[in-house]
Amino acid sequence: MIRNSKILMNKLKRIGLGQITSTNNKEDNFRKCKEMIEKAVENKVNLFCLPECFAFISGGIHQFESRDNAEYLDQKGGIIERYKDLAKQNNIWLSLGGFHEKILDDPNDMIYNTHLIIDSNGVIVCEYRKMHLFDVDIPSKGVKMNESKVVKGGNDLVVCDSPVGKLGLSICYDLRFPELYLSLRRMDAQILLVPSAFMKSTGEAHWKPLLQARAIENQTYVIAAAQTGDHHSKRSSYGHSMIIDPWGKVLHDLPDNLNDIAFVDIDLDYISTCRENIPVFNHKKLNNYKI
């Protein structure tokens, strides 16, 4: 099933997203993503977005599994080379959010969690390294995650020009830090990309309101491609990939456990309309806020 929402069809800027259940089987993940990209191409999508961990998600074997399966961005015959070929062959832009990137000569053998934009010529035009890392230890609930043990945080904010507008890049846990998105908006972002793999418990409580808040407060579209379903016996993702407009209206909300695509035709003029109706960025007192 393919879901489509049309907004002011005189403006043909079509963005799509894919919702998948990745595993530690790279070939199977690539096959699923390739099929989704081909569907997107059939439906004339200009930019197609895949979720965090699109290429690989830990099988729960050991805590360094993601690191051991990481690759360099320019690795000969690597997974990113295959996606670059897909983009070029299909004349489509790709947002690949949450790739385990090897760091050359890192003394601690760390990796980056990297969001890539690949253009329709198969060229990487933007790279964002996840800034906010998820470390939590709740003994009473038996929950312990330590992303920073394996992943090195990035420092650079990234806004990327594309045929569909200016893209503000982020990944998953970044969503909880509104200052990041405020900064992206101040860098003229029109569309916020939030590829994610939210856990079910936090997803049910916070996913939708956080996405709507980022859309409303920055008056931007939000495109949030998400992992869904059971990856292995100890890890499940919430799903509910969403596309939200600058007024906060949810245009798409893919059901949990559904591997599918959705797309919309967006009109950048609508962003201007929302910003004119409520010109909050003209009224901000940035010098007065102490953060």
Curated annotation (Swiss-Prot):
CN hydrolase domain boundaries: 13-268
Matches recorded under InterPro entries: C-N_Hydrolase, C-N_Hydrolase_sf, Nit1/2_C-N_Hydrolase, UPF0012_CS
Broad EC category: hydrolase
Alphabetized UniProt keyword annotations: Hydrolase
EC code: 3.5.1.128
Signal peptide residues on this chain, from the entry's feature table: none
Presence of the UniProt keyword Hydrolase in the record: yes
Listed Pfam families: CN_hydrolase
Any one GO MF annotation of this record: deaminated glutathione amidase activity
Protein name: Deaminated glutathione amidase
Gene that specifies this protein: nit1-1
